[in-house]
Swiss-Prot record:
Subunit-structure text: Interacts with UBA5. Interacts with UFC1.
PTM description: UFM1 precursor is cleaved by UFSP1, promoting its maturation: processing of the C-terminal Ser-Cys dipeptide is required to expose its C-terminal conserved Gly residue.
Keywords carried by this UniProt record: Cytoplasm, Disease variant, Isopeptide bond, Leukodystrophy, Nucleus, Ubl conjugation, Ubl conjugation pathway
Propeptide: 84-85
Cross-link (Glycyl lysine isopeptide (Gly-Lys) (interchain with K-? in acceptor proteins)): G83
Family matches, as CDD domains: Ubl_UFM1 (cd01766)
Compartment(s): Nucleus; Cytoplasm
Biological processes annotated in GO: brain development; negative regulation of apoptotic process; negative regulation of protein import into nucleus; protein K69-linked ufmylation; protein ufmylation; regulation of intracellular estrogen receptor signaling pathway; response to endoplasmic reticulum stress; reticulophagy
Species for this entry: Homo sapiens (Human)
The name this protein goes by in its record: Ubiquitin-fold modifier 1
Consequence of substituting L21A: Abolished ability to be activated by UBA5
GO cellular component: cytoplasm; endoplasmic reticulum; nucleus
Gene: UFM1
Length: 85
């Protein structure tokens, strides 16, 4: 089984820390979101993953589909920051 890698950046931190995650392409993207949120110590239930262009990603698909549609560079935003200036 092949793997896909994502570089996920935490946009709510001014230092823009990132993590690189490699997961099997059949992994549910909800699991990727949950793991990334835990790594950044933000609540997974109130976080969203978006593309660098600001397009939200529906987590109800596999990691392989997300990789094919959106590429490897993604951002995680805690939802308390969504829409704030």
């Amino acid at each position: 089984m092949s793997k896909v890698s994502f570089k996920i950046t935490l946009t709510s931190d001014p230092r823009l820390p990132y993590k690189v995650l490699s997961v099997p392409e059949s992994t549910p993207f909800t699991a990727v979101l949950k793991f990334a949120a835990e790594e950044f110590k933000v609540p997974a239930a109130t976080s969203a993953i978006i593309t660098n262009d600001g397009i939200g990603i529906n987590p109800a698909q596999t990691a392989g589909n997300v990789f094919l549609k959106h590429g490897s560079e993604l951002r995680i935003i805690p939802r308390d920051r969504v829409g704030s200036c």
